[in-house]
């Protein structure tokens, strides 16, 4: 079935989880499959949540938090962090659009990339350690779900910025508002099923932040790329943690 073929495609492409499965894949499958990435986020988050529960039996919760974040990088291969770095190198170079796109494709790592990646990782760690441990497992499970929603929003609300082909083109060209609707439904079902306190409020903000982020990036370069989809994913996760902290803090 197309559903399982596309889900496996996303697991293979976006994670290091070893799944040996081969089938005929089209460029359209990549864009259509993007609707299913909240499920991929749930798989990643589920692994992280179980790992955290085991780690806190041995280590202090702050050590457990940093180890879980390292596990996240390992599970994803840093693919979205790479996109974050490339995006910041290009967008904040203060160059014309075409030069920005060239910088984003350059394999060399610039100062903006290093600062962006380090800042996001530190922010994620600091916020996690400030969250009430009673909520930690649920917060961790939903962390990659909120992030991957950002990729769907970004792809469905933008056009491809480069001339010619690129990996991001398949996602952006074929991820339509239909995929966005499916993705948001899956995202909402997962969010509410996990049962995080005030989850119905918290789940709205990653949608809004993703829209704001993609509008900003597309205004800078006239569209989006695969790197930008990854950048929005990572930034969305950090803004999600900020939202969780704020909502739980003011809840008292």
Swiss-Prot record:
GO terms for biological process: cobalamin biosynthetic process. One of its GO terms (molecular function) is adenosylcobinamide-GDP ribazoletransferase activity. Signal peptide: none annotated. One of its GO terms (cellular component) is plasma membrane. InterPro entries: CobS (IPR003805). It is an enzyme of class 2 (transferase). Its EC number is 2.7.8.26. Its main location: membrane. It is a multi-pass membrane protein. Pathway: Cofactor biosynthesis; adenosylcobalamin biosynthesis; adenosylcobalamin from cob(II)yrinate a,c-diamide: step 7/7. It catalyses: alpha-ribazole + adenosylcob(III)inamide-GDP = adenosylcob(III)alamin + GMP + H(+); alpha-ribazole 5'-phosphate + adenosylcob(III)inamide-GDP = adenosylcob(III)alamin 5'-phosphate + GMP + H(+). Joins adenosylcobinamide-GDP and alpha-ribazole to generate adenosylcobalamin (Ado-cobalamin). Also synthesizes adenosylcobalamin 5'-phosphate from adenosylcobinamide-GDP and alpha-ribazole 5'-phosphate. HAMAP family: CobS. This is Adenosylcobinamide-GDP ribazoletransferase. It comes from Clostridium acetobutylicum (strain ATCC 824 / DSM 792 / JCM 1419 / IAM 19013 / LMG 5710 / NBRC 13948 / NRRL B-527 / VKM B-1787 / 2291 / W). The lineage of its organism: Bacteria, Bacillati, Bacillota, Clostridia, Eubacteriales. The gene is cobS.
């Amino acid at each position: 079935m197309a559903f399982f073929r596309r889900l496996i495609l996303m697991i293979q492409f976006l994670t290091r989880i070893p799944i040996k499965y081969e089938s005929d894949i089209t460029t359209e499958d990549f864009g259509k499959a993007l609707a299913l990435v909240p499920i991929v986020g749930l798989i990643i988050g589920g692994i992280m949540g179980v790992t955290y529960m085991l780690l806190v039996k041995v280590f202090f919760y702050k050590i457990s938090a940093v180890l879980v974040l390292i596990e996240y990088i390992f599970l994803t291969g840093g693919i979205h962090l790479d996109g974050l770095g490339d995006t910041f190198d290009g967008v904040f170079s203060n160059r014309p659009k075409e030069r920005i796109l060239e910088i984003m494709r350059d394999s060399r790592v610039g100062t903006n990339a290093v600062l962006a990646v380090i800042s996001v990782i530190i922010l994620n760690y600091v916020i996690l350690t400030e969250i009430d441990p009673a909520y930690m497992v649920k917060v961790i499970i939903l962390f990659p779900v909120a992030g991957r929603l950002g990729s769907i929003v970004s792809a469905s609300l933008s056009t491809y910025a480069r001339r010619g082909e690129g990996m991001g083109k398949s996602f952006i060209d074929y991820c339509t508002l239909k995929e966005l609707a499916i993705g948001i439904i899956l995202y909402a079902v997962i969010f509410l099923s996990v049962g995080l306190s005030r989850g119905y409020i918290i789940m709205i903000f990653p949608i809004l932040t993703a829209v704001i982020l993609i509008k900003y990036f597309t205004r800078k370069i006239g569209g989006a790329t695969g790197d930008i989809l990854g950048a929005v994913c990572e930034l969305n996760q950090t803004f999600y943690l900020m939202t969780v902290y704020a909502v739980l803090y003011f809840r008292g």
